[in-house]
């Protein structure tokens, strides 16, 4: 959706193309709160206000849910290079003002937290959470010009990481840091191994 003076519009990209080697099974298919984690994260992004939800998945057939009017699929055509190829495709294809990127394996994420991330100080500026452990580039808002910046970086020294792009944005003023306090930090804890999984999202109770 185009920029309007009275509204800031953002799309979301859900990163679900990882190989999940340590987990041993596709993280996006783990059942949490009675539904696959992929579906739960799509629901949260919609509740937070995403105009369109994109999903970056591994090459091959799109995972379930395979069809929905509000979902657009991006096949990872460059496996092994991390999340940036999918992010670049979505940034180039989106006509919103910014793209909120979210890793699928953050089970305690909430629509409220996502709305905070998607609330930049001004148009053309992105936002990235920072905890005591560092920046969180896989739950961050990237302004659309980030695609052009990344293309410059690729031409100079190869495929960039989201962290490097975010750090450059902070340095140049088109990304702002959102401090995360101790109460909200669990929203950014991800699942990596089988012992991390629970059918109930962390912090929601039994």
Located regions from the model:
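Terminal amphipathic alpha-helical/low-complexity segments used for targeting or macromolecular assembly
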Residues: 203-206
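Nucleotide and nucleotide-moiety/phosphate-recognizing core
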Residues: 2-160, 167-187, 195, 201
């Amino acid at each position: 959706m185009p920029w309007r003076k009275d509204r800031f519009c953002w799309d979301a990209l859900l990163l679900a193309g990882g190989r999940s080697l340590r987990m041993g099974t596709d993280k996006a298919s783990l059942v949490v709160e009675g539904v696959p984690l992929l579906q739960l994260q799509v629901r949260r992004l919609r509740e937070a206000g995403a105009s369109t939800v994109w999903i970056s998945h591994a090459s091959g057939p799109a995972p379930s849910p395979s069809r929905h009017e509000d979902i657009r699929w991006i096949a990872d055509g460059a496996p092994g290079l991390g999340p940036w190829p999918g992010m670049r495709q979505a940034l180039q294809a989106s006509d919103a003002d910014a793209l909120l990127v979210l890793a699928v394996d953050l089970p305690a994420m909430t629509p409220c937290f996502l709305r905070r991330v998607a609330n930049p100080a001004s148009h053309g500026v992105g936002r990235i959470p920072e905890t005591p452990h560092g920046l969180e580039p896989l739950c961050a808002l990237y302004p659309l010009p980030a695609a052009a910046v990344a293309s410059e970086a690729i031409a100079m020294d190869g495929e960039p990481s989201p962290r490097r792009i975010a750090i450059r944005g902070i340095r140049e003023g088109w990304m702002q840091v959102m401090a995360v306090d101790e109460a909200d930090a669990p929203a950014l804890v991800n699942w990596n191994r089988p012992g991390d999984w629970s059918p109930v999202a962390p912090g929601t109770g039994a």
